[in-house]
Structures are given as C-alpha cells and as structure tokens.
Regions:
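Short, charge-rich amphipathic segments
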Residues: 1-8, 29, 100, 136-152
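Amide-forming acyltransferase catalytic core, primarily the GNAT-like/NAT-type
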Residues: 1-41
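A generic structural signal for ordered alpha-helices
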Residues: 7, 16, 20-21, 70, ...
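Residues that form generic nucleotide/phosphate-binding pockets
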Residues: 13-17, 28-29, 69-72, 91, ...
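Generic secondary-structure transition motif, activating predominantly at the C-termini of alpha-helices
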Residues: 18-22, 30, 96, 100, ...
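Conserved beta-hairpin
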Residues: 31-51, 167-182
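Acyl-donor-binding surface of acyltransferase catalytic domains
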Residues: 35, 41-142
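Flexible, substrate/cofactor-facing loop regions flanked by secondary structure
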Residues: 117-184
Length: 184
C-alpha cells in the first residue's frame, strides 16, 4: 500500500533509492546516527526523503505525497529541499510555487589532502585582538544550546557526549561571548 509517508525503521531498505549519493547527512539518516528516513511504503519503498535538521533529500520515484509531507518533528518554517532528479525538482516547484526558491549550495570537498592548512592558519592569525578561536568543548556546547542564533551549531546532537563522539566544531569568542562558529 503506497501513499501517506511513513517513518522507516529499517532505514537500509531505502539505501538503494539514494544510490551512491555521497552526502553525509543522508548517510547519517541511513545509519540511524541522526535524522529520519520517510518512505511511501515501509516494506518496498520506491520514494524516500531523508530529513536532518534544516535539510531534506528526496530520492527514488518523485512522489507528491513525499514532497508535500512535513514530519511532526519539523518545527521550522523553512527547509532546504535537495532533489535527486529533475522530476523531484519540478514536483517541489509544483507543490510550493513561489515559496520554492532555487539556490546553489556549495558542497564541502571530500577528497583527502585537499584542505589548505595555510589558508586556515592565515584566517586564524587575522583575528582581531580580543577574539579567540576555540574547539567546541562541553562548555561551548552548552553555550551554543542556550543561544538562539547559534543553536544550529550543535542542535542535531542529543547531548555533548554524542557531539564529542560524532561531531567537531570551532567557535570564535570575544571575551565570554560566542560571536561565530562552524560545526558538523
């Protein structure tokens, strides 16, 4: 029976739909680390969406019921929808009209040894006096959680132990105030 999307318990049933899509957020959902997978049919999925934070990835057969579905744990007023195919992209526009705004998302390079450490050192050394760069530890994790503007730096992790095991991030502080950050 196909129709109303269901949360998939055996997430690996959707793996074939996502194919070799090299996207960390999708794999986090498939491996049940974070996020959820919703499908058109739990026993034989043909359409799927992986939802993690502000991101939603569509795979398999483009289905209107999947595109228009909002999981009960999605409270934000927006979501970044990433279509696997042109059919999914067209369905997003059909369903959301002017609210769907196409954008280019810049991907992080995943190749080994591509990161330029000198560029990073230069950025760190250019911090103005009074600003410091710190790795996100338990104290900064708690600070991120308590500040609306930077909750997203750590919001996908249920607690600091999970973050310490699976995440990494850095924050810039001016005095005791967090002013910038980047995190997985």
């Amino acid at each position: 029976d196909y129709g109303m999307p269901v949360k998939l318990k055996d997430t690996m049933k959707a793996k074939k739909l996502f194919g070799d899509w090299q996207e960390t957020l999708i794999w986090s959902c498939l491996q049940k680390v974070m996020g959820d997978i919703y499908v058109d049919n739990a026993s034989d999925p043909q359409s799927a969406m992986a939802v993690l934070g502000d991101f939603c990835f569509f795979a398999g057969n483009a289905e209107e019921d999947i595109v228009s579905f909002k999981p009960e744990n999605c409270f934000q007023d927006f979501i970044i929808m990433v279509p696997q195919s042109e059919e999914w992209a067209e369905l997003i526009v059909k369903n959301y009209g002017d609210r769907a705004k196409p954008a280019t998302r810049y991907a992080i390079k995943k190749e080994q040894n591509i990161f330029d450490k000198d560029t990073l050192r230069s950025a760190v050394n250019s911090l103005k006096p009074g600003y410091i760069l710190r790795m996100i530890d338990a104290d900064l994790f708690a600070l991120c959680r308590s500040s609306t503007w930077c909750q997203d730096l750590v919001s996908q992790f249920r607690d600091y132990e999970m973050y310490k095991k699976l995440g990494i991030g850095f924050a810039v502080l001016k005095g005791k105030s967090l002013v910038a950050g980047a995190s997985s």
